[in-house]
Amino acid sequence: MKKLLFAIPLVVPFYSHSAETVESCLAKPHTENSFTNVWKDDKTLDRYANYEGCLWNATGVVVCTGDETQCYGTWVPIGLAIPENEGGGSEGGGSEGGGSEGGGTKPPEYGDTPIPGYTYINPLDGTYPPGTEQNPANPNPSLEESQPLNTFMFQNNRFRNRQGALTVYTGTVTQGTDPVKTYYQYTPVSSKAMYDAYWNGKFRDCAFHSGFNEDPFVCEYQGQSSDLPQPPVNAGGGSGGGSGGGSEGGGSEGGGSEGGGSEGGGSGGGSGSGDFDYEKMANANKGAMTENADENALQSDAKGKLDSVATDYGAAIDGFIGDVSGLANGNGATGDFAGSNSQMAQVGDGDNSPLMNNFRQYLPSLPQSVECRPFVFSAGKPYEFSIDCDKINLFRGVFAFLLYVATFMYVFSTFANILRNKES
């Protein structure tokens, strides 16, 4: 009896902390909060958590961490808390946990109707206003040599963010004749990029966009960056398992690293294997590094700079020629020669004295013709005599003719000797 009385204080607090009833739980207000130890129902995909003796269901925009055990959302009380071993299988353990095969459910992004518990934004629903980066009414498609890596599937369409716009895969295009090359065409559907939190090309629980005029539907990962890394290319499927493993063991779409159930306590470890496509990755890097390059703009910019340099050099040369011409013609020292004014002022007329004047003194004096005047000998003497101009002009004409003949003969004989020497 004493032992029983001693045990009563230990048993009463154990039951008193969970004195909630269904009515008291349902009367609790909704709360927007982040709960831990969250599990997901394998069939409805709803998320549940025990808190303060009540069972809560996550509604609205549900955002979870990478291991999906902590989620943020609008939590609604639906009844009394349930033991952890009776959960939906995500907590591992109980006999009613997730199956032992760990095959995983079909990724919801391939369906046309969103599955409850997931948040979607349809890239084709027309909620994207026109912008300046791209004009969806007059799209400018981009052609890729190979299917790019950074794409994601949604409602049977493949999308890609590129150059500040959301683009959608619209088929293949062939160009050329020898050889014929096939390109993958992506056409803009929005003037804004769509930022998505996904792994292995799949949406997880949150897709959001930003920068719109309307009130955007934005959600972020709590405790984890929304920019998740890309998995290896062509990763193989994981081999999930474990007796208490969650429903998302290996993943039917090649989850690779999520084997064994990321939400459960199962002991099975997933494994993924695949060949890394180096060529595809190289093409993706090439496209990422060159997608913003505008060849025409670069050529135009280079041509403009070269034309400017050529114009400056041409103007400098023209100015120098003008300065030299002015200095030679006595127009003053200007431009490049303006600094020599003080020195030139000490010579002649300074910079107003043509340079040619300084060279004329070194030129030989050539005879100049004058008006004919009679030659008078011994003027005023008894034996004075004179030669009239008509006789002088006659002599000049005869002498000039003889000089012409002699010059012609000299030139003719010179060329004749050259020709004779060439023939011999």
UniProtKB/Swiss-Prot annotation:
User: Which residue stretches does the UniProt record annotate as biased composition, category Polar residues?
Assistant: 132-147
- Signal peptide range in chain numbering: 1-18
| Example of a GO cellular component annotation carried by this entry | viral capsid
Could you tell me the Gene Ontology terms of the biological process aspect for this record? adhesion receptor-mediated virion attachment to host cell; entry receptor-mediated virion attachment to host cell; viral extrusion; virion attachment to host cell pilus
Q: Where is this region: Disordered?
A: 83-147, 222-279
Where is this chain compositionally biased, Gly residues type? 86-105, 235-273
What ranges does the record give for the region Hinge, renumbered to this chain? 105-141
State the residue spans of region: G1 (Gly-rich linker): 86-104
Membrane topology (UniProt): Single-pass type I membrane protein
Could you state what the record's PTM comment says about this protein?
In one of the crystallographic structures Trp-39 is oxidized to 1',2'-dihydro-2'-oxotryptophan.
Pfam families reported for this sequence: Phage_Coat_A
- Segments carrying the region annotation (N1) are 19-85
Q: Where is this region: N2?
A: 142-228
Q: Which cysteines are joined by disulfide bonds?
A: C25-C54, C64-C71, C206-C219
Q: Where is this region: G2 (Gly-rich linker)?
A: 236-274
Superkingdom of source: Viruses
Subcellular location per UniProt equals: Virion; Host membrane
Membrane-spanning ranges: 398-418
Q: Which residues form a coiled coil?
A: none
On subunit structure and binding partners, the annotation says: Interacts with G6P; this interaction is required for proper integration of G3P and G6P into the virion. Interacts with G8P. Interacts with the tip of the host pilus. Interacts (via N-terminus) with host TolA. Interacts (via transmembrane domain) with host TolQ (via 2nd and 3rd transmembrane domains); this interaction allows the phage translocation across the host inner membrane. Interacts (via transmembrane domain) with host TolR (via transmembrane domain); this interaction allows the phage translocation across the host inner membrane.
| Domain text | Consists of 3 domains (N1/D1, N2/D2, and CT) separated by glycine-rich repeats and a C-terminal transmembrane segment. The N2 domain interacts with the F pilus, whereas the N1 domain forms a complex with the C-terminal domain of TolA at later stages of the infection process. The C-terminal domain is required for release of viral particles from the host bacterial membrane and proper integration of G3P and G6P proteins in the virion.
Q: Which family does it belong to?
A: Belongs to the inovirus G3P protein family.
Function of this protein? Plays essential roles both in the penetration of the viral genome into the bacterial host via pilus retraction and in the extrusion process. During the initial step of infection, G3P mediates adsorption of the phage to its primary receptor, the tip of host F-pilus. Attachment of the phage causes pilus retraction bringing the viral particle into close proximity of the host cell inner membrane.
Name of the protein in question: Attachment protein G3P
Q: What is the lineage of its organism?
A: Viruses, Monodnaviria, Loebvirae, Hofneiviricota, Faserviricetes
